[in-house]
From Swiss-Prot:
EC number, as in UniProt: 2.5.1.19
Gene designation per UniProt: aroA
Organism placement in taxonomy: Bacteria, Pseudomonadati, Pseudomonadota, Gammaproteobacteria, Enterobacterales
Source organism of the structure: Citrobacter koseri (strain ATCC BAA-895 / CDC 4225-83 / SGSC4696)
Pathway noted in the entry: Metabolic intermediate biosynthesis; chorismate biosynthesis; chorismate from D-erythrose 4-phosphate and phosphoenolpyruvate: step 6/7
Entry similarity comment: Belongs to the EPSP synthase family.
Protein name as annotated: 3-phosphoshikimate 1-carboxyvinyltransferase
Role: Catalyzes the transfer of the enolpyruvyl moiety of phosphoenolpyruvate (PEP) to the 5-hydroxyl of shikimate-3-phosphate (S3P) to produce enolpyruvyl shikimate-3-phosphate and inorganic phosphate.
Length: 427
């Protein structure tokens, strides 16, 4: 297996221009494909997950052109439902942001489509979404294990009243919301359980509005969407920088700044993960907000005990930043870490112990007490881009760290390690 050893870093200082947001990129691609008119997306993320979405749209007859660096995409919208010519199988890797929305959107109209992916994708639950789509008339079969991909979709979704469990993943609701306007009837979506990762729903609603569709949001408990609508291209659309990706650089600034500034997001960003900066501030770092940047300057860091449900992806970065804070850090209400690219609660606890931390792994929380001295370790990354990026922060000590399978960052940030090196001064 490939590995990368990071030598100790004495100081970080500089500016990072963030790649486009994964959450925004894949939503925007799908809406542009469904819309009438041509859409030019700029600052699109070039990563595995986005390539899976693009390949799927291409197989569904959507035409687009990409710039050489794959960050500008001009898409010709279909002005409605996506149709496959005959039976089709789409391979979506481990891209939840492609699997969930496509599973819903391809239940409109008459299709016969199989959605499949990597072995890990077949372990990521999709039953709550399928249940909701079936209530709206969709014909869906599980081809292997009940409640998990691969799925066979044969159209039939017509709207009406559907209930969806919101306690596992907000992507199920996102998928229903983006599909509902194209259904023949109005759709009312009622949420069962507590809705996790609410800010991701705001991204969805924001993008739908950009493409000309309004949703009635009744306090995140019920959503009412009129049927027989059409998405309309906004013409040009700039994809915000990825706020989850920003978290590693901002944390590095908090631990070993200098000052690290990330551009492409700012105080008015639609991504909930910008709230990560508030956590660093609470720990003792200094944060400066601009319209198009967030900057973090080093501070004496103290442990925090916080509910992290609103920023599940960025919260992982706090788990490794906790190694540099005084006291015991507790991250709560993060059950949905368990259904991401890997079981992130287990993975994080296991790897933090390797570098010497004392860790308590709960059902939906993690408690971390840093050691007096970090130990050198080879960090397993579980084919999870965020594990690789989180543990790069260990090098901000006087101990090197080895990251196994470093290329797994390609899911969202192919040149992450080069960017980190660019702002680092070796010890």
């Amino acid at each position: 297996m490939e590995s990368l050893t990071l030598q100790p870093i004495a100081r970080v200082d500089g500016t990072i221009n963030l790649p486009g947001s994964k959450s925004v990129s894949n939503r925007a691609l799908l809406l542009a494909a469904l819309a009438s008119g041509t859409t030019v997306l700029t600052n699109l993320l070039d990563s595995d997950d986005v390539r899976h979405m693009l390949n799927a749209l291409s197989a569904l007859g959507v035409s687009y052109t990409l710039s050489a660096d794959r960050t500008r995409c001009e898409i010709t919208g279909q002005g409605g439902v996506l149709h496959a010519e005959g039976a089709l199988e789409l391979f979506l890797g481990n891209a939840g942001t492609a699997m969930r929305p496509l599973a819903a959107a391809l239940c409109l109209g008459a299709n016969d489509i199989v959605l499949t992916g990597e072995p890990r994708m077949k372990e990521r639950p999709i039953g709550h979404l399928v249940d909701a789509l079936r209530q709206g008339g969709a014909k869906i079969d599980y081809l292997e294990q009940e409640n998990y991909p691969p799925l066979r979709l044969r159209g039939g979704f017509s709207g009406g009243h559907v209930e969806v469990d919101g306690s596992v993943s907000s992507q199920f609701l996102t998928a229903l919301l983006m599909t509902a306007p194209l259904a023949p009837q109005d759709t009312t979506i009622a949420i069962k359980g507590d809705l996790v990762s609410k800010p991701y729903i705001d991204i969805t609603l924001n993008l739908m509005k950009t493409f000309g569709v309004e949703v009635e949001n009744q306090n995140y408990q019920r959503f009412v969407v009129k049927g027989e609508q059409q998405y309309r291209s906004p013409g040009q659309y700039l994809v915000e920088g990825d706020a989850s990706s920003a978290s590693y650089f901002l944390a590095a600034g908090a631990i070993k700044g200098g000052t690290v500034k990330v551009t492409g997001i700012g105080r008015n960003s639609m991504q909930g993960d910008i709230r990560f900066a508030d956590v660093l501030e609470k720990m003792g770092a200094t944060i400066t907000w601009g319209d198009d940047f967030i900057a973090c300057t080093r501070g004496e860091l103290n442990a925090v005990d916080m509910d992290m449900n609103h920023i599940p992806d960025a919260a992982m970065t706090i788990a490794t930043a906790a190694l540099f804070a005084k006291g015991t850090t507790t991250l709560r209400n993060i059950y949905n870490w368990r259904v991401k690219e890997t079981d992130r609660l287990f993975a994080m606890a296991t790897e933090l112990r390797k570098v010497g931390a004392e860790v308590e792994e709960g059902h939906d929380f993690i408690r971390i007490t840093p050691p007096a001295q970090l130990q050198f370790a080879e960090i397993g990354t579980y084919n999870d881009h965020r594990m690789a990026m989180c543990f790069s922060l260990v090098a901000l000590s006087d101990t090197p760290v080895t990251i196994l399978d470093p290329k797994c960052t390609a899911k969202t940030f192919p040149d992450y390690f080069e960017q980190l090196a660019r702002i680092s001064t070796p010890a």
